[in-house]
Design a protein with these regions (language model features):
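Surface-exposed loop/turn segments connecting beta-strands in extracellular beta-rich domains
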Residues: 21-24, 46-49, 71-74, 97-100, ...
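Long, acidic/serine-threonine-rich intrinsically disordered regions with weak helical/coil propensity
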Residues: 160-161, 165-178, 183-202, 206-228
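Intrinsically disordered, low-complexity terminal regions
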Residues: 118, 130-134, 141-142, 146-150, ...
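All-beta strand scaffolds that present successive hydrophobic residues in beta-strands
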Residues: 11-16, 36-42, 61-67, 87-92, ...
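Short, small-residue-biased leader/transition segments that mark boundaries at the very start
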Residues: 1-4
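Solenoidal tandem-repeat scaffolds enriched in leucines and small polar residues
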Residues: 52-177, 182-183, 188-189
Length: 371
């Protein structure tokens, strides 16, 4: 069968079907405007460019159970949203994209996914633009983005504002509870030219050997038209809850980063201030808050604006790391080879501004009897 577009006031129920498209822009299932699609136990394959597997835009609503989706073109996310946003709730299923620039999930809507396999074989795993949200529950997420000279770096999940007009400017949200992330190339999380909230809870992460960072929160070189050079940083609230992490956290002075480690979280890495894309600089910061029972294992000299530590900070050999103020004050004298340089330091941790991951039950939709 062909693509199924749904427009104003329309409702469609799709069950035990096969949907295939072989034309540019041929989405599998498409909900638009006041339209709603309910779909279950269906195979969807798209072959050409700009052909999402399941697609919502203009406020459309799409609810899916146990679909098997594969896309093969460029700009063809398996779960795709577009200008005007909408709502997508996915429960179970397998979603695979094979093209360049085709993430498993392209998010310019409010999307929640539970117990699904999400794989991008030729792209980053997730793109989130602007005032939109993606919440993943007990799902397995894989990305394999190729290096590109137009980009400052390579990533697995990006939260950004492209300035294309496809999404309203505002805070991007990424939450993940359980499940796995597999990064086959590049760093893990990259955020630029936006405001965002990232929260991870007990996610099992597999890194590639060339991973350059765990989180990069910086401006960009504007080769892609993402904001104004020297003023296109990111304001990011990052929370790790019962989360093991590995890799550097990179930030710059045109970005604001609040980094919270809670409930026994661990980080093996360094905090690196990199002004490469910060122009003349700004008043940005990197504030790190480490709760009791959380641990930072330092792997290199680090620079932080404010460090609030009620947990444990050592190097990989268990040696105490020196914590020194930019004014020369020694807050902690250690025997490690590494030093943490801070603007301010305290040995307590206020995590009241951290993010609590929402429950799947807040987004779960009852499957219609007709499906």
């Amino acid at each position: 069968t062909c693509a199924l577009p749904i427009s104003t006031d329309g409702t469609a129920y799709v069950k035990d079907s096969t949907v295939t498209t072989d034309s540019k822009g041929g989405a599998g299932l498409f909900a638009y405007g006041d339209g709603t699609v309910y779909a279950a136990d269906t195979d969807i394959t798209t072959q050409q460019d700009t052909s999402g597997g399941i697609h919502a835009a203009g406020g459309g609503k799409l609810y899916a159970w146990d679909l098997n989706v594969e896309t093969n073109g460029e700009s063809s996310a398996a779960i795709r949203s577009d200008r005007g946003g909408g709502t997508m709730v996915v429960d179970g299923g397998t979603y695979t994209s094979n093209g360049v620039g085709s993430p498993a999930v392209y998010c310019t809507a409010d999307i929640a996914v539970n117990n699904a396999e999400l794989t991008a074989n030729g792209s980053e795993a997730v793109c989130i633009e602007g005032l939109n949200s993606l919440r993943l529950y007990n799902s397995n997420l894989t990305g394999n983005m190729s290096d590109d000279d137009q980009n400052d770096t390579t990533w697995t999940v990006i939260l950004y504002q492209s300035m294309s007009g496809d999404s309203e400017v505002g805070n991007s949200t990424f939450q993940m509870d359980g499940g796995t992330i597999t990064s086959k190339n590049g760093g893990l999380f990259y955020t630029t030219n936006t405001e965002c909230t990232i929260a991870l809870k007990d996610v099992d992460i597999t890194y590639n050997d060339d991973s350059e960072f765990f989180l990069q929160c910086t401006g960009n070189n504007n080769q892609r038209g993402w904001g104004q050079s020297g003023a296109n940083g990111s304001d990011c609230n990052f929370t790790a809850d019962s989360q093991d992490m590995k890799g550097n956290v990179i930030w710059d002075s045109i970005s604001d980063l609040d980094f919270y480690m809670t409930n026994g979280s661990t980080l093996e890495g360094a905090f690196v201030n990199d002004e490469s894309n910060a122009g003349n600089g700004g008043d940005g910061y990197c504030n790190v808050v480490i709760e009791k029972d959380s641990t930072w294992t330092v792997t290199g000299d680090s620079t932080i604006t404010s460090l609030s530590n009620a947990g444990t900070i050592t190097d990989a050999d268990g040696k105490t790391v020196s914590i020194v103020g930019i004014d020369g004050t020694t807050y902690v004298e250690g025997d490690s080879d590494y030093t943490i340089t801070v603007g301010s330091y305290q040995d307590s941790a206020d995590t009241s501004a951290s993010t609590t991951v929402d429950d799947w039950s807040s987004y779960e939709v009852e499957r219609p009897e007709s499906l």
